[in-house]
Design a protein with these regions (language model features):
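Active-site-proximal or metal-binding-adjacent scaffold patches in catalytic folds
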Residues: 1-61, 70-109
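Walker B catalytic acidic pair
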Residues: 66
């Protein structure tokens, strides 16, 4: 797993809390949630949960996918799997020799 390399590549500034759960989630293989401060309203950290059982993608690809959502949050790109997501998915696939960070028809807009 190249978690720190992915974070550095994306230029993430906020901490990433990665949780791996060894059970299946019927809705998604992974999920991203931004955590904001109650006092200041500013982004505090990124919460990523990987539900790692019988997945269609490998662990590195799932983590890269969710980290792109973290990048979107830090850079205020309010889209789910739009233009910016696809651009960074392609960049990460090329840089780290990953496949299917974004899957058309699976990753919904």
């Amino acid at each position: 797993m190249k978690l720190y390399e992915y974070i550095k590549f994306l230029g993430l500034k906020k901490p990433v809390n990665l949780r791996i759960v060894t059970r299946k989630n019927r809705f998604a293989d992974a999920e991203y949630e931004a955590e904001y401060s109650d006092k200041t309203g500013k982004l505090k950290e990124h919460q990523i949960t990987i539900f790692y059982k019988d997945n269609s993608r490998n662990l590195d690809t799932l983590i890269a996918h969710e980290l792109i959502h973290a990048w979107q949050e830090e850079n205020k790109k309010a889209e789910t799997h739009g233009e910016y997501f696809k651009k960074y998915a392609r960049k990460m696939e090329k840089e780290f020799n990953l496949t299917e960070i974004y899957i058309d028809g699976v990753d919904l807009e």
